[in-house]
A protein has these predicted regions:
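Domain-level signature for proteins that mediate thiol-based redox and metal-cofactor handling
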Residues: 1-109
């Protein structure tokens, strides 16, 4: 099914909402508010979805766990038929990418 641009934006918003359920177990904050999600691409014709994300450090041992949780979270968005999570390292993650909520929750000014 082909979606309008408005419908695609709505679906991407629901994808982000679903991703807010994926919590970094070390920090206790979701990956969206941590600023780990860099891009979401949703193909309105196929339902294929690509998510570009990073980690707080290159050697983060939670990559597989977070990726698995992302796949699980996408089951809440029925329009998403296939998901590919791409780990990206540029631009590098910094605390400035965190939302105000995340910085307050972690005591960072």
């Amino acid at each position: 099914m082909a979606y309008t641009e408005e419908q695609i934006e709505n679906i991407k918003t629901r994808i982000l909402t679903a991703l807010e359920e994926v919590i970094d177990p070390e920090l206790g904050i979701d990956i969206v508010n941590l600023g780990l999600i860099y891009a979401i691409r949703f193909d309105g014709d196929t339902g294929d979805t690509e998510i570009d994300m990073t980690l707080t450090t290159m050697g983060c041992p939670l990559a597989d766990l977070l990726t698995d949780q992302i796949y699980d979270a996408m089951t809440d968005v029925p329009e998403v038929t296939n998901v590919e999570v791409k780990l990206v390292w540029y631009p590098a993650w910094t605390v400035e990418k965190m939302s105000r909520y995340a910085r307050i929750a972690l005591g960072i000014k």
